[in-house]
Amino acid sequence: MIANIDTNVGKLRTVLDSEGLTEDTIFIFTTDNGTSSGDGVFNAGMRGKKGSEYDGGHRVPFFVHWPAGGLTGGRDVEPITAYVDVLPTLIEMCHIESPAGVTFDGRSIQSLLTGNTDKAWPDRILVTDSQRVKDPIKWRKSAVMTSRWRLNNGKELYDIKADPGQERNVAQDHPATVARLTDFYDAWWAELEPTFANATAIYLGHPADNPARLTSHDWITTGSTPWNQSHIRRAMTGKSNTGFWNVKVVESGEYEVRLRRWPEEADLAINAPLAPGAPVPGAQAFRTTPGKAIDPTTASLRIGNLSTKKDIPADAKEVAFTIKLEAGKTTMEATFEQADGEIFGAYYAYVTKK
């Protein structure tokens, strides 16, 4: 993976050079989480890996190159920064008017990147956590962070300057720091908690996305959603095999809902297997998992208080329902059931307003 990233970043920069775009392109390289839980690789002595509340799980590189803006390398930024700072920074760099009525969680770090600042940077506090559960749990896998301190899970305090590997819990030695970080987290949680029930909804019937395409990756479930093709191909059982979508019906009217085991472009029957995908040199690709054949006899659809069911014709590629929906937010669940009672979620659904 490292070699692949290196090669492709090089290709991208070569294109920018050849097109004469390098000078005034803001080029950013970063990652979405800490070191992978796969092969053991260099982790700079940090504790934890991907998904961890310790720095090894969420501290990531962030490189910016922009010659026209004076960013050509050779400068390290010491104060703590985070992903919430990216948008405010780009707004300032590009001289874009900040949208009215929007309060950003982050702040522009342009002055830190350029070194052109005549005032001290504030000792700010940031929070990250790794919930990975349906209903968030206070303090779960959390880190309350300053440039010096890490309060993990509300109990462990680490001086990241003296102990970057987070080996020595010094919470008992610094009660005032623990209290300060705890108070910040409590206020942060109180602000967010009322929004937990308002999960993002997928719009149905919007002119810009009609039909709407729903996949199992967006299921809300108590298990782990099928987030890669291997999960779908294996037709996992248990909590991870069913779920529901939060949806928002944009306009009242008649809708067609088509349920599929495989995506429309695969053009396969619901009860058909799927051949393994082409391998990827040097890696185990999710698509190489053979697609398991299931044999459901009925398809069920629930949207809000409306429930309906249909028999699945032999070798059908999809099951279609025509229903009338009222505008507003609701939930949608679609399943396939076999004769033996085993239930599978409909991994793909296509919703069209007529």
Model regions and ranges:
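Metal-dependent active-site segment of extracytoplasmic phospho-/sulfohydrolases and closely related
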Residues: 4-43
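The feature captures the short pre-catalytic strand/loop hairpin that immediately precedes
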Residues: 63-73
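Long, internal low-complexity/basic segments
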Residues: 86, 170-354
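Non-transmembrane alpha-helical segments in soluble domains
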Residues: 9, 13, 17, 87-91, ...
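C-terminal cap/loop subdomain of S1 sulfatases and analogous C-terminal strand-loop tails that border
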Residues: 35-53, 71-75, 79, 84-87, ...
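Beta-strand elements within well-structured catalytic alpha/beta cores of enzymes
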Residues: 2-5, 9, 26-31, 61-62, ...
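Short beta-strand-to-coil "C-cap" segments at the C-terminal boundary of structured domains/repeats
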Residues: 65-67, 160, 350-354
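Aromatic-acidic/polar surface patches that form glycan- and anion
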Residues: 2-5, 76-83, 102, 174, ...
